[in-house]
Curated annotation (Swiss-Prot):
Its biological purpose: Involved in the post-transcriptional modification of the uridine at the wobble position (U34) of tRNA(Lys), tRNA(Glu) and tRNA(Gln). Catalyzes the conversion of 2-thiouridine (S2U-RNA) to 2-selenouridine (Se2U-RNA). Acts in a two-step process involving geranylation of 2-thiouridine (S2U) to S-geranyl-2-thiouridine (geS2U) and subsequent selenation of the latter derivative to 2-selenouridine (Se2U) in the tRNA chain.
Catalytic activity of the protein: 5-methylaminomethyl-2-thiouridine(34) in tRNA + selenophosphate + (2E)-geranyl diphosphate + H2O + H(+) = 5-methylaminomethyl-2-selenouridine(34) in tRNA + (2E)-thiogeraniol + phosphate + diphosphate; 5-methylaminomethyl-2-thiouridine(34) in tRNA + (2E)-geranyl diphosphate = 5-methylaminomethyl-S-(2E)-geranyl-thiouridine(34) in tRNA + diphosphate; 5-methylaminomethyl-S-(2E)-geranyl-thiouridine(34) in tRNA + selenophosphate + H(+) = 5-methylaminomethyl-2-(Se-phospho)selenouridine(34) in tRNA + (2E)-thiogeraniol; 5-methylaminomethyl-2-(Se-phospho)selenouridine(34) in tRNA + H2O = 5-methylaminomethyl-2-selenouridine(34) in tRNA + phosphate
Family: Belongs to the SelU family.
Residue span, Rhodanese domain: 14-137
Active site: 97 (s-selanylcysteine intermediate)
Alphabetical list of Pfam families matching this protein: Rhodanese
Organism: Salmonella enteritidis PT4 (strain P125109)
EC number assigned by the record: 2.9.1.3
GO molecular function, one term: tRNA 2-selenouridine synthase activity
Designated name of the protein: tRNA 2-selenouridine synthase
């Protein structure tokens, strides 16, 4: 316990996936948390708000007294039992509040009264957050190689196969396009950045890193945006472009968006509700780009999508989806990406099929 109390090497704590018993209010946790943290609040949102109002009007002593009145009796005991259970499950864990102040110290003292010595994070979440921001800035200074290519080129798979690859879309829980959402909701911006920082630290720690391999992304991946320090470095980075046959790209997209997403939705929600969610997911993706398609073209593709869904529901075949996917690629996604890539033409260092790019990466 004493050694752990003194061991406030924040990077080491993040690298080790150290369990954190985060006693901040749920709203604070949702706004930003560290990977591996579990939220077991000392005060719920309404209790925290009441204490905050009391602090502004009557001062610190009155606010502290109100906090103890709000968290007492059965409520206090229930929360204490939850903290005890968490520590028993994660005996190498740490208590964490916003700044390592009263909340984590109060919980620590209450646990000590039951015979449990649980260390706390000095400086709290704010200190860990600052460490994550600094780590991302520092590690983003290393050389970067981008993997580019049109939709369906298998870029994400290629990045994942690299020992120095960072799957930005996986971290963001989004595949980048209007159809990119997954069944897992995206994290808050701060939580995404924290998760990215920990991933960079881990990859950097386990090898002699010459450079990062990242997918060529825009500023945003769904609702998350890339840290500006990383985005600036990516804008200057060399690019290896995957140029696979159109038919192969279609098969990848069929597998990812029509077969796998249908499976994931039905597995999560059951056949009927899963099918409805899958259908709404595809319609939402098309609806999101309706203005760029033009309303007439959007209506035409929506009708084609409806027919494709009816065919898939009745026969299980996904062939009908090609009738709207092919024009969507030809008229929207491919021209858009090629226009963006043309602006970065000076950064392109290699072009080839997926396998040729994979072989080229190995030779670097």
């Amino acid at each position: 316990m004493q050694d752990r109390q003194k061991a406030q090497d924040y990077r080491a704590l993040l690298l080790a996936d150290t369990p954190l018993i985060d006693v901040r209010a749920p709203i604070e946790f949702e706004q930003g948390a560290m990977p591996g943290a579990i939220n077991l609040p000392l005060m719920m949102d309404d209790e925290r708000a009441a204490v905050g109002t009391c602090y502004k009007r009557q001062g610190a002593d009155a606010a502290l007294a109100l906090g103890h009145r709000l968290v007492c009796g059965d409520i206090r005991q229930q929360r204490l039992e939850a903290w005890k259970a968490a520590y028993q499950r994660f005996p190498n864990g740490y208590l964490c509040c916003a700044r390592g102040g009263q909340r984590s110290h109060i919980v620590q003292r209450w646990l000590q009264e039951t015979g449990i010595d649980c260390p706390l994070i000095e400086g709290g979440y704010k200190a860990l957050r600052q460490t994550a921001i600094q780590a991302t800035w520092q590690l983003a200074q290393k050389p970067i190689l981008l993997i580019g290519g049109c939709t369906g080129s298998g870029k994400t798979q290629l990045v994942r196969q690299q020992p120095n690859g960072v799957d930005l879309e996986g971290l963001a829980r989004h595949r980048g396009s209007s159809f990119g959402r997954t069944l897992n909701p995206q994290l808050s911006q701060a939580s995404f950045e924290n998760k990215l920082a920990v991933e960079l630290l881990k990859i950097n720690a386990r090898q002699t890193l010459k450079r990062w391999v990242l997918e060529d992304e825009g500023r945003t991946i769904g609702a998350n945006h890339l840290p500006e320090c990383l985005r600036e470095r990516m804008a200057q980075a060399p690019i290896a472009v995957v140029e696979d046959p159109f038919a192969l790209r279609l098969e990848r997209l069929r597998e990812e968006y029509f077969i796998r997403m249908h499976h994931d939705f039905t597995h999560a929600y059951g056949d009927e509700a899963g099918w409805q969610a899958y259908s709404e997911y595809l319609h939402h993706g098309l609806f999101a780009i309706r203005r760029r398609l033009g309303l007439q073209r959007f209506a035409e593709l929506t009708d084609t999508l409806d027919r494709a869904l009816a065919e898939q529901l009745s026969s299980g075949s996904t062939d009908g989806h090609m009738a709207w996917l092919v024009p969507l690629l030809n008229e929207y996604y491919d021209p858009m990406y090629r226009y963006q890539l043309e602006k970065k033409a000076a950064n392109i260092v290699f072009r080839g099929t997926w396998q040729e790019v994979a072989n080229w990466l190995k030779a670097q």
